[in-house]
């Protein structure tokens, strides 16, 4: 993607503000596809017709979580098991006015405009319908690097109502359009083209989602570390950076991004390998003489301690760690790597040798503009209490665990 000249985010925001289409390209490690995206309040029947004729995908309308609540739009399913967790709500049509069946270009445009109209009430929308609202995650692409969040972020950055309309771009032969074809589409229709990774980098460059506290010395059994606390502005959660040694700009640093685990890190629980991994990471950094541990306050893969204990109870009753989360209405993994990425940037880390067995973590950090030059395994020996848990992580979550057969 870097070899092809894309448009800048600044250029894209200006066009978006004027009601023009953008082509937004996903990352190669994700769907690797492009969508036509436009601000919801700028939609017309003619523009909807263009999207359906030239996009050929599924017409959707990304809106915020708050807007979904205001319009009482429930999710299509309680447990979203789609590959990338695409957040579809129940489908809708605008009721009344000149709208009829909901399927015409006029009706679809009116429905999308209604979603972006603060005066629209839940009773103004028929369910089911012909428009697929998508619930964008709070904090946008800094929380989830998807087209849904990109549409809402672009609207906000353009000073418009935070809602959009999008459709996947499919080739005439029915295959998904990839970057070379998308470049040709952009040229044909004189539409600017950007990638989500650049939008993430723009937001990280222009916004601060964390603030740091005072730096202190922390003597440990693995030598001295510098400890810097960070507070996440969006929710007040506090995180920690442990730093050893000095490093140069762009130097590949040994890094562990570790989500908090009170049971394992503090009490030495044998139901997981978290505590052992944390101590092994500290030992390796001490041995190397330099490195960073980002300790994220994301207990239970992001669901919190109370919910984690409910999941533990379900595991005692026979469910595995993934199904326990899904049973409780959570995703298998709800961790937010955007905050970790900004903490790393704040302390000067842009390239790293990442200590992790989780390929999703690598993809998650790289999505925020960081470079993982090497993935360093940090595998520990399983015990009778965590072997099934680790087997589940290997088989259902893609963790690279050679000690698990």
UniProtKB/Swiss-Prot annotation:
Which InterPro entries is this protein grouped with?
Answer: DHBP_synth_RibB-like_a/b_dom (IPR017945), DHBP_synthase_RibB (IPR000422), GTP_cyclohydro_II (IPR032677), RibA (IPR000926), RibA-like_sf (IPR036144), Riboflavin_synth_RibBA (IPR016299)
Give binding positions for Mg(2+) 1.
31
Name the catalysed reactions. D-ribulose 5-phosphate = (2S)-2-hydroxy-3-oxobutyl phosphate + formate + H(+); GTP + 4 H2O = 2,5-diamino-6-hydroxy-4-(5-phosphoribosylamino)-pyrimidine + formate + 2 phosphate + 3 H(+)
Q: Does the keyword DNA damage apply?
A: no
Cofactor comment: Binds 2 divalent metal cations per subunit. Magnesium or manganese.
Required cofactor(s): Mg(2+); Mn(2+); Zn(2+)
Taken from the UniProt entry, a GO cellular component term is: cytosol
Q: In which pathway does it act?
A: Cofactor biosynthesis; riboflavin biosynthesis; 2-hydroxy-3-oxobutyl phosphate from D-ribulose 5-phosphate: step 1/1; Cofactor biosynthesis; riboflavin biosynthesis; 5-amino-6-(D-ribitylamino)uracil from GTP: step 1/4
Binding-site residues for D-ribulose 5-phosphate, renumbered to this chain: 30-31, 35, 144-148, 168
Sites where the protein binds GTP: 256-260, 277, 299-301, 321, 356, 361
The protein's job, in short, is: Catalyzes the conversion of D-ribulose 5-phosphate to formate and 3,4-dihydroxy-2-butanone 4-phosphate.
Instruction: Quote the protein name from its UniProt record.
Output: Riboflavin biosynthesis protein RibBA
User: Which species?
Assistant: Parabacteroides distasonis (strain ATCC 8503 / DSM 20701 / CIP 104284 / JCM 5825 / NCTC 11152)
- Source taxonomy lineage? Bacteria, Pseudomonadati, Bacteroidota, Bacteroidia, Bacteroidales
């Amino acid at each position: 993607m870097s070899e092809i000249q894309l448009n800048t985010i600044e250029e894209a925001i200006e066009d978006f503000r004027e009601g023009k289409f953008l082509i937004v390209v996903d990352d190669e490690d994700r769907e690797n596809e492009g969508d036509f995206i436009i601000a919801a309040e700028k939609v017309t029947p003619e523009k909807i017709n263009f999207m359906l004729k030239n996009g050929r995908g599924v017409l959707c309308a990304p809106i915020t979580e708050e807007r979904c609540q205001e319009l009482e739009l429930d999710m299509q399913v309680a447990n979203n098991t789609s590959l990338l967790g695409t957040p579809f709500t129940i489908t809708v049509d605008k009721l009344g006015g000149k709208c009829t069946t909901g399927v015409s270009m006029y009706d679809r445009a009116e429905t999308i405009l209604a979603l972006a109209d603060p005066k629209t009430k839940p009773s103004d929308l028929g369910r089911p319908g012909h428009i697929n609202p998508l619930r964008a995650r709070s904090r946008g692409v800094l929380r989830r690097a998807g087209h849904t969040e990109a549409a809402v972020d672009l609207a906000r950055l353009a000073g418009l109502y935070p809602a959009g309309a999008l459709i996947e771009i499919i080739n005439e032969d029915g295959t998904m359009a990839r970057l070379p074809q998308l470049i040709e589409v952009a040229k044909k229709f004189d539409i600017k083209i950007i990638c989500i990774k650049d939008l993430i980098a723009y937001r990280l460059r222009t916004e601060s989602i964390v603030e740091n506290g005072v730096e202190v010395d922390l003597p440990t059994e693995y030598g001295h570390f510098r400890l810097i606390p960070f507070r996440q502005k969006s929710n007040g959660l506090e995180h920690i950076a442990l730093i050893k040694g000095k490093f140069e700009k762009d130097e590949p640093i040994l890094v562990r991004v570790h989500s908090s685990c009170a049971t394992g890190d503090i009490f030495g629980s044998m139901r997981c390998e978290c505590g052992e991994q944390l101590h092994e990471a500290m030992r390796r950094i001490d041995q190397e003489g330099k490195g960073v541990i980002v300790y994220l306050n994301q207990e239970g893969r992001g669901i919190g301690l109370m919910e984690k204990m409910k999941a533990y109870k379900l595991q005692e009753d026979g469910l595995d760690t993934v199904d326990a989360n899904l049973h409780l209405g959570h995703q298998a993994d709800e961790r937010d790597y955007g905050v970790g990425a900004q903490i790393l940037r704040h302390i000067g880390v842009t390239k790293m040798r990442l200590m992790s067995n989780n390929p999703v973590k690598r993809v998650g950090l790289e999505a925020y503009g960081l470079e993982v030059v090497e993935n360093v395994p940090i595998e520990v020996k399983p015990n009778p209490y965590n072997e099934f848990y680790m087997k589940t992580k290997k088989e259902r979550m893609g963790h690279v665990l050679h000690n698990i057969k």
